[in-house]
């Protein structure tokens, strides 16, 4: 197999996006468009990848890191000019080079591999990736002769009525013999209405030189979808979302309503997990086997182990261990770690805290900056008072402790194992094992006093 190179065109600003964010950095299912392209090229085992940057160069480079080399296009003078900027990095290389836009996030590694194979088998100088468009309006058309050989690419504005009826379109992806690509680039001019150097002119030059120019027709038109505005971005998200959901269902995940299930590209989900409608799973979340994710849940960058049940709750950078459950309407914030077989009920919030195996936190509770041991009962309305107005402080609760309803644990404080906090207490001092802490005023009943009250 010959050496394979790739060029990603990512220098455009994308004014039609109407955004301060550079076009290729807009996200599709939780990953920037240009990163989608790069990931698929990596999967296709490309030897050498160069990304052409322009507007927002530093931001793009920060996003992609060392996964690719970079070439800078300081002036936006067309796609041909962009590829010329890779001359120092690529012109002397042997092999084949694929060129793809950074705003086409739906292409797959399989398509890139098939394009390379088709190109190499025919010993072509250039191969155009084409597709059949249901509505080809706006696309360049592929004009073939009577025996199916590619004659030229004609743009919409230049096409005759007969040519406009052609449904085979140019997807904007090309595979070139690398040496012949750069030889032809040296011959293109900017003698056109836009004053730009067009990559498509390379095709014409190669045809004039009687080089072999072919076209590989891919099956899935959706892959070729480019994103130039927010409408197209929404469409791309929908296509990618369907692809992601279909993948996980085929891997053994049940989705009650895939149309309303939103899963990012880097999420991982185990078998026999059930996901209800209206669920959003983002970032690098990992979900184990046999989990149940209830309607309306939102999970971001969290790790969910096997057999976990989440009902209408929000998790951010949290972890839930085997057999634990939460919800409805509770919130795990960053650095919350829930141990095995822990129950977190409704309207609870946990932040920067560890809750040990078998502990139960039923309802209406805030736990922040705390470590809780095993088999603790936390009653309704308990507040871990962690903030003194300046600093956050830590609370420790030992194994088998009992925290009565409507109690406040004022940090820093240590509730020893096997100790008991009476309901309604405000605890400011630590306890010893087997202590029962009561911190509330003694009740006084004043006879007949209610008769004096105005109500």
Curated annotation (Swiss-Prot):
<feature type="binding site">
    <location>
        <position position="140"/>
    </location>
    <ligand>
        <name>UDP-N-acetyl-alpha-D-glucosamine</name>
    </ligand>
</feature>
<dbReference type="GO" id="GO:0000902">
    <property type="term" value="P:cell morphogenesis"/>
</dbReference>
<keyword id="KW-0677">Repeat</keyword>
<feature type="region of interest" description="Pyrophosphorylase">
    <location>
        <begin position="1"/>
        <end position="230"/>
    </location>
</feature>
<feature type="binding site">
    <location>
        <position position="405"/>
    </location>
    <ligand>
        <name>acetyl-CoA</name>
    </ligand>
</feature>
<feature type="binding site">
    <location>
        <position position="155"/>
    </location>
    <ligand>
        <name>UDP-N-acetyl-alpha-D-glucosamine</name>
    </ligand>
</feature>
<dbReference type="GO" id="GO:0071555">
    <property type="term" value="P:cell wall organization"/>
</dbReference>
<keyword id="KW-0012">Acyltransferase</keyword>
<feature type="binding site">
    <location>
        <begin position="78"/>
        <end position="79"/>
    </location>
    <ligand>
        <name>UDP-N-acetyl-alpha-D-glucosamine</name>
    </ligand>
</feature>
<feature type="binding site">
    <location>
        <begin position="386"/>
        <end position="387"/>
    </location>
    <ligand>
        <name>acetyl-CoA</name>
    </ligand>
</feature>
<keyword id="KW-0808">Transferase</keyword>
<dbReference type="InterPro" id="IPR029044">
    <property type="entry name" value="Nucleotide-diphossugar_trans"/>
</dbReference>
<dbReference type="GO" id="GO:0006048">
    <property type="term" value="P:UDP-N-acetylglucosamine biosynthetic process"/>
</dbReference>
<dbReference type="Pfam" id="PF00132">
    <property type="entry name" value="Hexapep"/>
</dbReference>
<feature type="binding site">
    <location>
        <position position="423"/>
    </location>
    <ligand>
        <name>acetyl-CoA</name>
    </ligand>
</feature>
<dbReference type="InterPro" id="IPR050065">
    <property type="entry name" value="GlmU-like"/>
</dbReference>
<feature type="binding site">
    <location>
        <position position="170"/>
    </location>
    <ligand>
        <name>UDP-N-acetyl-alpha-D-glucosamine</name>
    </ligand>
</feature>
<dbReference type="InterPro" id="IPR001451">
    <property type="entry name" value="Hexapep"/>
</dbReference>
<comment type="pathway">
    <text>Nucleotide-sugar biosynthesis; UDP-N-acetyl-alpha-D-glucosamine biosynthesis; N-acetyl-alpha-D-glucosamine 1-phosphate from alpha-D-glucosamine 6-phosphate (route II): step 2/2.</text>
</comment>
<comment type="pathway">
    <text>Nucleotide-sugar biosynthesis; UDP-N-acetyl-alpha-D-glucosamine biosynthesis; UDP-N-acetyl-alpha-D-glucosamine from N-acetyl-alpha-D-glucosamine 1-phosphate: step 1/1.</text>
</comment>
<comment type="similarity">
    <text>In the C-terminal section; belongs to the transferase hexapeptide repeat family.</text>
</comment>
<feature type="binding site">
    <location>
        <begin position="101"/>
        <end position="103"/>
    </location>
    <ligand>
        <name>UDP-N-acetyl-alpha-D-glucosamine</name>
    </ligand>
</feature>
<feature type="binding site">
    <location>
        <position position="377"/>
    </location>
    <ligand>
        <name>UDP-N-acetyl-alpha-D-glucosamine</name>
    </ligand>
</feature>
<feature type="region of interest" description="Linker">
    <location>
        <begin position="231"/>
        <end position="251"/>
    </location>
</feature>
<keyword id="KW-0511">Multifunctional enzyme</keyword>
<keyword id="KW-0961">Cell wall biogenesis/degradation</keyword>
<dbReference type="GO" id="GO:0000287">
    <property type="term" value="F:magnesium ion binding"/>
</dbReference>
<dbReference type="GO" id="GO:0019134">
    <property type="term" value="F:glucosamine-1-phosphate N-acetyltransferase activity"/>
</dbReference>
<dbReference type="GO" id="GO:0005737">
    <property type="term" value="C:cytoplasm"/>
</dbReference>
<feature type="binding site">
    <location>
        <position position="228"/>
    </location>
    <ligand>
        <name>UDP-N-acetyl-alpha-D-glucosamine</name>
    </ligand>
</feature>
<dbReference type="GO" id="GO:0008360">
    <property type="term" value="P:regulation of cell shape"/>
</dbReference>
<keyword id="KW-0479">Metal-binding</keyword>
<feature type="binding site">
    <location>
        <position position="440"/>
    </location>
    <ligand>
        <name>acetyl-CoA</name>
    </ligand>
</feature>
<keyword id="KW-0573">Peptidoglycan synthesis</keyword>
<keyword id="KW-0548">Nucleotidyltransferase</keyword>
<feature type="binding site">
    <location>
        <position position="228"/>
    </location>
    <ligand>
        <name>Mg(2+)</name>
    </ligand>
</feature>
<dbReference type="GO" id="GO:0009252">
    <property type="term" value="P:peptidoglycan biosynthetic process"/>
</dbReference>
<keyword id="KW-0133">Cell shape</keyword>
<feature type="binding site">
    <location>
        <position position="366"/>
    </location>
    <ligand>
        <name>UDP-N-acetyl-alpha-D-glucosamine</name>
    </ligand>
</feature>
<comment type="similarity">
    <text>In the N-terminal section; belongs to the N-acetylglucosamine-1-phosphate uridyltransferase family.</text>
</comment>
<feature type="region of interest" description="N-acetyltransferase">
    <location>
        <begin position="252"/>
        <end position="455"/>
    </location>
</feature>
<dbReference type="InterPro" id="IPR011004">
    <property type="entry name" value="Trimer_LpxA-like_sf"/>
</dbReference>
């Amino acid at each position: 197999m010959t050496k394979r190179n790739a060029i990603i065109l990512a220098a455009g600003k994308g004014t039609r996006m109407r955004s301060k964010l550079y076009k290729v950095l807009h996200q599709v299912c939780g990953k920037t468009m240009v990163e989608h392209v790069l990931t698929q090229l990596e999967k296709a085992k490309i030897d050498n990848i160069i990304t052409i940057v322009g507007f927002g160069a530093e931001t793009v480079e920060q996003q992609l890191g060392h996964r690719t080399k970079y070439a800078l296009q300081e002036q936006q003078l067309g796609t041909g000019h962009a590829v010329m900027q890779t001359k120092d990095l690529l012109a002397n290389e042997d092999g084949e080079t694929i060129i793809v836009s950074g705003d086409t996030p739906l292409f797959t590694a399989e398509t890139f591999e098939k394009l390379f194979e088709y190109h190499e088998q025919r010993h072509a100088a250039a191969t155009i990736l084409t597709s059949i468009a249901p509505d080809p309006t706006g696309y360049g058309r592929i004009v073939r002769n009577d025996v199916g050989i590619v004659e030229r690419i004609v743009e919409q504005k230049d096409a005759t009525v007969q040519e406009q009826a052609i449904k085979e379109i140019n997807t904007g992806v090309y595979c070139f013999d690398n040496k012949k690509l750069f030889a032809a680039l040296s011959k293109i001019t900017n003698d056109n209405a836009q004053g730009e150097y067009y990559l498509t002119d390379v095709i014409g030059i190669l045809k004039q030189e009687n080089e072999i120019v072919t076209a590989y027709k891919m099956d899935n038109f959706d892959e070729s979808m480019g994103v130039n505005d927010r409408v197209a971005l929404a469409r791309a998200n929908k296509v990618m979302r369907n692809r992601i959901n279909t993948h996980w269902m085929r891997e053994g995940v049940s989705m009650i309503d895939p149309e309303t299930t939103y899963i990012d590209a880097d999420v991982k989900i185990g078998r026999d997990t059930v996901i209800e409608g209206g669920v959003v799973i983002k970032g690098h979340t990992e979900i184990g086997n046999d989990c149940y994710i209830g309607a309306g849940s939102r999970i971001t960058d969290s790790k969910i182990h096997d057999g976990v049940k989440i009902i209408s709750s929000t998790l951010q950078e949290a972890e839930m261990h085997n057999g634990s459950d939460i919800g409805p309407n509770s919130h795990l914030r960053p650095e919350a770690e829930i141990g095995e077989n822990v129950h977190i009920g409704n309207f609870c919030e946990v932040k920067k805290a560890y809750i040990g195996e078998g502990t139960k936190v039923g309802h209406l509770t805030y736990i922040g900056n705390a470590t809780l041991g095993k088999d603790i009962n936390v009653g309704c309305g308990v507040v871990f008072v962690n903030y003194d107005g300046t600093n956050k402080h830590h609370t420790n609760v030992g194994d088998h402790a009992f925290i009565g309803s409507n109690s406040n644990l004022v940090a820093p404080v240590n509730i020893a194992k096997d100790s008991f906090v009476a309901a309604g207490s405000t605890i400011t001092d630590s306890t010893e094992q087997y202590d029962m802490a009561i911190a509330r005023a003694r009740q006084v009943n004043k006879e007949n006093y209610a008769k004096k009250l105005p109500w």
